[in-house]
A protein has these predicted regions:
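Conserved class I S-adenosyl-L-methionine
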Residues: 1-31, 138
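Conserved SAM/SAH-binding beta-strand->alpha-helix loop
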Residues: 63-65
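Conserved SAM-binding strand-loop segment of SAM-dependent methyltransferases
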Residues: 76-89
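A short acidic, Gly/Pro-enriched loop at the edge of an enzyme's catalytic core
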Residues: 89-100
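A short SAM/SAH-binding and catalytic strip from SAM-dependent methyltransferases
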Residues: 99-114
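A short glycine-rich, Lys/Arg-flanked "PGG" loop and its adjoining helix->strand segment in the class I
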Residues: 114-126
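Conserved beta-strand signature within the Rossmann-like core of class I S-adenosyl-L-methionine
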Residues: 127-135
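Short alpha-helix
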Residues: 151-173
Length: 199
C-alpha cells in the first residue's frame, strides 16, 4: 500500500467532496462536453464535479483506494467518471487527445516533474486549457497543507518556463488564499495559480 492509499484509507474524504475554488472559477473556459483529464484526482472531488458539468472526464491517480472512493462519489452524484490507475512518473496521455487538463495540488518531484508536465501539456488539443493550482514555496510558512519539500512546490515563473513552446500563459499568479477543502487543506495558504492554452 503506497502513501496515498494509506492516506485515502482514512474515513471520509481527505480533501472534501467539493471542487477546488479556482477550478470552479475557471471551468467556464471549457466548451460544452469537453474531454477533460484530471491527473492526481485522488478521491475524485474535481473530476466528479466536472462530470456533473457535462464533461467527459478521465481521472487518473496512483492510488487505487482513492479511485475507488472517486467512483463511489460519482455514483452518489449520479455521474459517469472514467478512472485509471497510473504513475505520472512514467505515464503520458495520447498527444492532442483532450480539451483540458486539470492539475489541482499535484506536487511532483523534480526528478520527473518537467517530463510529466510537458507530456500532460502535449496531451492537449490545440486551444485546449491547462488549469493548475498548487502550493508555492512560501507555503512552507503555513500549516494548511502541502509537501514540506521545496523541490515539490511551484512558482508561476517555473511553470511558465517548463511549459514554454507548448502553452501560452493566460494567468500566472501567486499569493495568499484561505482554503477549506476537507481536513487536508484548511486555513491560510500561499498558492500558485497558472492557466495556459495549448499553442
Amino acid at each position: 500500500m503506497n502513501f496515498w492509499d494509506q492516506r485515502f484509507s482514512e474515513s471520509g474524504f481527505k480533501y472534501g467532496t467539493e471542487p477546488n475554488a479556482f477550478l470552479r472559477m475557471e471551468a467556464g473556459r471549457l466548451s460544452a462536453a469537453s474531454r477533460v483529464l484530471v491527473p492526481g484526482d485522488g478521491e475524485g472531488r474535481n473530476g466528479v464535479w466536472l462530470a456533473g458539468q457535462g464533461h467527459a472526464v478521465t481521472s487518473v491517480d496512483n492510488s487505487s483506494v482513492g479511485l475507488q472512493k472517486a467512483q463511489t462519489l460519482a455514483a452518489e452524484k449520479g455521474v459517469t467518471l472514467t478512472t485509471t490507475l497510473v504513475d505520472l512518473a512514467d505515464w503520458s496521455p495520447a498527444p492532442a487527445s483532450v480539451d483540458a487538463v486539470v492539475l489541482i495540488y499535484v506536487h511532483l518531484p523534480g526528478s520527473f516533474r518537467l517530463r510529466a508536465h510537458r507530456a500532460l501539456a502535449a496531451g492537449l488539443k490545440p486551444g485546449g486549457w491547462l488549469i493548475l493550482e498548487a502550493f508555492h514555496p512560501l507555503q512552507l510558512q503555513h500549516a494548511s497543507g502541502g509537501p514540506k519539500d521545496v523541490d515539490m512546490l511551484y512558482t508561476p515563473e517555473q511553470l511558465t518556463e517548463e511549459l514554454a513552446g507548448l502553452l501560452q500563459p493566460a494567468q500566472a499568479w501567486q499569493g495568499e488564499t484561505n482554503l477549506s477543502e476537507g481536513p487536508g487543506h484548511q486555513g491560510l495558504a500561499h498558492v500558485t495559480r497558472w492557466l495556459g492554452q495549448r499553442i
